[in-house]
Amino acid sequence: KLAELSMTAILEWYSKYLLHNKIIPHDKFEIVWPEDLNYNDFVTMYEIDQLVLREDLIAPPQITYAWYQYNNYTHIAIRSIVTQKVIGYFTVLPITDQLYEDIQSGYFKDNDLSTDNLRKYDIPDFYKLYIACVCIHPNYQNTSAFNRLYNALLKMMIELATEREIYVTNIITEASTIQGEKFCKILGLKRLLNTKINTKIYGATLLPPSWQLRSSFGTKLMKYYKEKYEELRELF
């Protein structure tokens, strides 16, 4: 027992030393897939939000965890193997057509969003996706964490489409910081408008396909969507 406690203390000290000196071990990350998250992870996500986002645009963990309980595909995260804590995540919400229009108009905040505005992936169908948050802890923003997480999101979208016929027609998101705008550009999203609350709305269309992606997972995703569009063209 004493040996276990000593090892735990050493690991905790080592983790704090790495973070204090901003020494991030190369690629020591693992993806936390949607079904593997717990409430404590959402508290950690909230703490990351407070470091990088505007306070008035942050949804508390009680709200985000309720989204996750309603549809556990709403969140995908990445964790440090060293600290065993989430260090970044995507919030990707399948939303109603009405909410999509509200977000597109520029008059909406995440903490106003309830499960009434969300959809479950319970039937094969076409869905609109709201990327409510893309966050990486500041200490990990110059590592491979974002690319690992981004590719995991694309992999999840491929699997939803090919295995369950869950197709995303439109993606929309809101950038409130310079880092958020950077992420939107990396994601290949186009700016749609500037809002009156000093944010920018970005978006992309998958059906008909216009989203430009460069990664191997992105190329695979859009190849599949282009084939599906040709198959279902009469619906659009």
Go through each PLM region and give its residues.
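Short amphipathic alpha-helix that is part of the acyltransferase structural core
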Residues: 14-63, 70-71, 75-87
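Conserved acetyl-CoA-binding loop-helix of GNAT-fold acetyltransferases
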Residues: 131-136, 141-159
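Short, well-ordered beta-strand micro-motif
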Residues: 77-79, 91, 203-206
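Conserved acyl-donor/pantetheine-binding loop and adjacent beta-alpha core of acyl/acetyltransferases
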Residues: 91-135
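Amphipathic alpha-helical scaffolding segments
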Residues: 65-67, 92-95, 151-153
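Short helix-terminating capping/connector loops at secondary-structure junctions
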Residues: 71, 123-125, 162-168
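Terminal substrate-recognition subdomain of acyl/acetyltransferases
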Residues: 1-37, 159-236
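A structural microfeature
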Residues: 87-88, 193
